[in-house]
């Protein structure tokens, strides 16, 4: 139901975007979930990365009640989250050539693993280089990005390419360039970003698909339960012990 107040307008816009990704990205979501299920079944590890606010959707699938225990956060110091001071340093680091390759070469990632790279614009050096180098190392790469940026902005990577150009599977968040859903005559800039809502939903849709795919194959999905329900800690201890060699957030 439409609402003329900003809060209602934003929620309507977010709901419309969620419907679009549900309908238009269904095949890509299915493919991404299947890729994660294949990786789990074949003994691989799962990783997710996002810079700045894009890291929120990556963090939301790591050590998460109802999520896959095998999903690990790939961290880049000063880039994941906005806890670095000044916060603008994180944005600057995204544009540094060579950083992504150094991170991957120092990480536990190896051929046969799957890496989800989340970048709204997909234009900066870090996500582009990360996808390129990850594939060169033999990883499967899923990109979560807004494809609109590739046609309406220029790449900041030396190759002139975007994240979407170096992924096995691309999930398009449909977010408009600028990431702001609302405008008002009385407000001098667009406002109310929806990228976190949509990107987090895409990530959960992919992990849900992966869990169901594993179950369809007769494999118990390595899921975590909430630690705030009876028996949750015992359940999680069993799963973390069983898959400990593929889980890095406990080390």
Curated annotation (Swiss-Prot):
Superkingdom of source: Bacteria
Domain spans labelled SIS: 36-220
InterPro entries registered for this protein in UniProt: RpiR-like_SIS (IPR035472), SIS_dom (IPR001347), SIS_dom_sf (IPR046348), SIS_GmhA/DiaA_subfam (IPR050099), UPF0309 (IPR022951)
Cited Pfam families: SIS_2
GO biological process: D-glycero-D-manno-heptose 7-phosphate biosynthetic process
Single GO MF annotation: carbohydrate derivative binding
SUPFAM superfamilies: SIS domain
A single Gene Ontology CC term: cytosol
Protein family (similarity comment): Belongs to the UPF0309 family.
Protein name: UPF0309 protein SCO4393
Species this protein is from: Streptomyces coelicolor (strain ATCC BAA-471 / A3(2) / M145)
Source lineage: Bacteria, Bacillati, Actinomycetota, Actinomycetes, Kitasatosporales
